[in-house]
């Protein structure tokens, strides 16, 4: 399969990349690292860092507000930093229990709420998802006030130790939350009253990352068990599983991307061609649709819809084994699947260590890895043409 040749390398970190995010308009990339830094890259202009935000511990997560004015970052010592992006200044620092680890931060699409996933590093402890008003978080405080964490408007607690929360995101117009768990389960919770709307177990090990496409009604999850799962958001049922060939691979990150179909409006070779437009139509028999998607011609590979959905994932074997195996055995390549029929469309090796985070904006894919670099790729149609 063709590699992606248009790769831009962003170098500036001294330790592994933990999380990367695009700005809302896609013109900038933010990368968080174990070197206690968050770097902003104006990658479209050059490959140099434009600004560095500094923590006092390893930075785990980044979240950019929808209006692109505020950034929330969380670290491994239970601290959250709120930044003014326009003025590149720190608004305030919130300190939770130092035994807590900030696992995820999410801001609602209307910029009203922020949810923070917190978990202790010890095994015999539960985890929390706290919800705050953004107006409260962005309100400047004195140094003394900043030492006391603000009171959350809502708190959701894991019910058992085995179901510790990993990541939380808003869904259904901010009326509910999707929360991934360490036991491989995924649950949807009513944001108002905390009642569980749906719950299902899709993996045999911890869900390391998940992404949601509201327009297409799907959820994509990646796990330590090496599988990538595609889930129907409406029914909360499994649509299909993708299993990379490398059995040692942890799938650390996943994203959903939608691109134009290169075969749209081409003459149809087979009458059994499935369209991405009706893949998740609940009135259709999903098994019939999936079975007709395996026709060998290119039209059936991509469907005849105007757009196709890509399921992108990456990871690699545990970093402690990286020095004992070669780059190919480590499973550090980035995989691009057709979400319609599960076919692997592209696989390319770019990093020299496990990939920890993926982000996508339009046709630009960014990856951050243990090798302390961020790599930016252009998703072009020629990528999917086999030689």
Model-derived features with residue positions:
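Residue-level detector of Asp-centered blade-edge/turn motifs that repeat once per structural unit
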Residues: 24-25, 66-67, 109-110, 172-173, ...
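WD40-repeat beta-propellers
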Residues: 38-42, 80-84, 126-135, 186-190, ...
């Amino acid at each position: 399969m063709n590699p992606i040749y248009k790769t831009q390398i962003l170098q500036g970190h001294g330790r592994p990349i933990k999380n990367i995010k695009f700005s809302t308009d896609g013109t900038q990339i933010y990368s968080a690292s174990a070197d206690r830094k968050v770097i902003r890259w104006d990658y479209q202009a050059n490959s140099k860092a434009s600004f560095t935000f500094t923590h006092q511990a390893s930075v785990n997560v980044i979240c950019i507000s929808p209006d692109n004015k505020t950034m929330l970052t969380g670290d491994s010592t239970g601290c959250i930093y709120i930044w003014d992006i326009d003025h590149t200044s720190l608004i305030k620092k919130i300190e939770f229990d130092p035994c807590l680890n900030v696992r995820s931060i999410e801001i609602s699409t209307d910029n009203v709420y922020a949810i923070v996933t917190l978990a202790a590093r010890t095994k015999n402890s539960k985890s929390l998802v706290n919800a705050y008003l953004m107006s409260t978080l962005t309100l400047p405080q004195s140094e003394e006030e900043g030492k006391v964490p603000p009171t959350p408007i809502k708190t959701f607690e894991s019910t058992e130790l085995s179901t510790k929360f990993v990541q939380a995101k808003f869904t259904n117009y901010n009326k509910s939350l999707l929360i991934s768990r360490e036991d491989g389960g995924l649950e949807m919770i009513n944001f108002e009253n905390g009642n569980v709307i749906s719950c299902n177990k899709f993996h045999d090990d911890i869900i390391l990352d998940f992404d949601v496409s509201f327009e297409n009604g799907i959820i994509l999850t990646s796990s330590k068990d090496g599988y990538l799962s595609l889930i129907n958001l409406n029914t909360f049922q499994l649509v299909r599983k993708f299993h990379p060939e490398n059995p040692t691979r942890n799938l650390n990150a996943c994203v959903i991307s939608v691109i134009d179909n290169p075969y749209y409006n081409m003459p149809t070779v087979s009458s059994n061609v499935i369209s991405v437009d009706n893949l998740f139509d609940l009135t259709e028999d999903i098994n019939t649709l999936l079975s007709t998607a395996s026709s060998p011609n290119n039209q059936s590979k991509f469907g005849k819809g105007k757009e196709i959905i890509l399921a992108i994932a990456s990871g690699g074997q545990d970093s402690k084994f990286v020095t004992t195996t070669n780059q190919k055995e480590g499973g550090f390549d980035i995989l691009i699947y057709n979400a319609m029929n599960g076919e692997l469309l592209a696989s390319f090796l770019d990093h020299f260590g496990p990939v920890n985070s993926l982000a996508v904006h339009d046709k630009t894919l960014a990856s951050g890895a243990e090798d302390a670099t961020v790599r930016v790729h252009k998703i072009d149609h020629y990528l999917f043409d086999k030689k």
